[in-house]
Amino acid sequence: HQGYFKDQGIDLHIQYSYGGPELARAFNGGSVHIGEMGLPPFATAYQQGMSARIIGSSVIQQLDHYLAARPDIISIEGLAGRRIGILSGGSCDDYFIRKILATREIDPNGDVELVPLGKDYGKPGLIADRHVDAAFVVEPQLARGEHEGLLRVIDRVADYYPRYQWGIILASQAWLNQKMDLLGRLM
């Protein structure tokens, strides 16, 4: 937005998506040719035929990704029969919550309801307003929600994945075949 890409002679349009599956659809439709996505949604999309390759890494670290719930829910076991907010079906959140629930023998397909939040993702008010009973929340919204008594942390993803390949940069096969110079300049 400050002209960096234009100064490099690159005509770039930035498009936001709400999770890896949505981005994979944009790749498959040809409207996106370079992007960043979580590794689990990429692996799924690639197995389903997405014509893209990993060209870089954006983050490898512990995940500062916390599962927060209403203050009256004190553990993962308390989520049985509840609504849990995730970014989107097939997103990293979906992958993470399924792992967390499985360790407590809670069936993510029957014992809870997973609610895609899309553009509302990360808003602590969703828990306070009881739109969902729990959701993944990151800073600074997490500290604000705890301070205001809207939520409590009941688990963290880093306990399950101490070092995690959080984000990958991918490019469409078409651009890898035809626009390597441009990809190099973008990177």
Regions from the language model: what does each represent?
Residues 1-119, 123-129, 133-139, 150-157, ...:
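Short, glycine-/small- and polar/acidic-enriched structural segments
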Residues 2-6, 166-187:
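Extended ligand-binding regions for polar small-molecule ligands
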Residues 145:
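Short helix- or helix-capping micro-motifs
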